[in-house]
């Protein structure tokens, strides 16, 4: 006995597209998340702005004032007559001269007494002492002060300090050369004052830095030598 079966076709057309694979969907989500994380990481490692660098400073206020007093005299020297001309047309040179002299003095004092001590741990001053055996004769003595060698010196503070310390007198020398070419001898006198003040600070802080390093080196050698001798003479040392 034989039986024949006829396949019954459904009225609803079959979906030719296969069902979505959950593994593929999860894989795409992981890929997108990885790309997003990589973009975020790349964005966070971008170039730092001046604000970001100032935030890393140990003394941001002192660093800002140092940069201001170092750069303000140069800016006022170039554009000072323009701004003064907007206020008054009389005695522009005298006002320009007085403002620059005040900025030179403020920069010299701030660098010598505040910025050097806070940013790089260095300070200097000059003393006048009477010479022994000679009445009425005096000698100038340079006194250098350095911070504790264990004190942390911020690299950003140190880099900005030394760059502006040496860059400013170079800029004033360029301006002095231009004044000679233009026969501006009154401004040349002003620039000579700026060069003398800036070079004095540059030379003094350079000597102070070398003195501090040499003193720390000698102290380190002496402490090691005395420690070695004491350990050898100590009978209880292992």
Curated annotation (Swiss-Prot):
<feature type="glycosylation site" description="N-linked (GlcNAc...) asparagine">
    <location>
        <position position="42"/>
    </location>
</feature>
<dbReference type="InterPro" id="IPR008564">
    <property type="entry name" value="TVP23-like"/>
</dbReference>
<feature type="transmembrane region" description="Helical">
    <location>
        <begin position="91"/>
        <end position="111"/>
    </location>
</feature>
<dbReference type="GO" id="GO:0009306">
    <property type="term" value="P:protein secretion"/>
</dbReference>
<feature type="transmembrane region" description="Helical">
    <location>
        <begin position="153"/>
        <end position="173"/>
    </location>
</feature>
<feature type="glycosylation site" description="N-linked (GlcNAc...) asparagine">
    <location>
        <position position="126"/>
    </location>
</feature>
<protein>
    <recommendedName>
        <fullName>Golgi apparatus membrane protein TVP23</fullName>
    </recommendedName>
</protein>
<feature type="transmembrane region" description="Helical">
    <location>
        <begin position="175"/>
        <end position="195"/>
    </location>
</feature>
<comment type="function">
    <text>Golgi membrane protein involved in vesicular trafficking.</text>
</comment>
<feature type="glycosylation site" description="N-linked (GlcNAc...) asparagine">
    <location>
        <position position="129"/>
    </location>
</feature>
<keyword id="KW-0472">Membrane</keyword>
<keyword id="KW-0325">Glycoprotein</keyword>
<keyword id="KW-0812">Transmembrane</keyword>
<keyword id="KW-1133">Transmembrane helix</keyword>
<keyword id="KW-0333">Golgi apparatus</keyword>
<feature type="region of interest" description="Disordered">
    <location>
        <begin position="1"/>
        <end position="51"/>
    </location>
</feature>
<comment type="similarity">
    <text>Belongs to the TVP23 family.</text>
</comment>
<dbReference type="Pfam" id="PF05832">
    <property type="entry name" value="DUF846"/>
</dbReference>
<dbReference type="GO" id="GO:0016192">
    <property type="term" value="P:vesicle-mediated transport"/>
</dbReference>
<feature type="glycosylation site" description="N-linked (GlcNAc...) asparagine">
    <location>
        <position position="24"/>
    </location>
</feature>
<dbReference type="GO" id="GO:0000139">
    <property type="term" value="C:Golgi membrane"/>
</dbReference>
<feature type="compositionally biased region" description="Low complexity">
    <location>
        <begin position="30"/>
        <end position="46"/>
    </location>
</feature>
<feature type="transmembrane region" description="Helical">
    <location>
        <begin position="67"/>
        <end position="87"/>
    </location>
</feature>
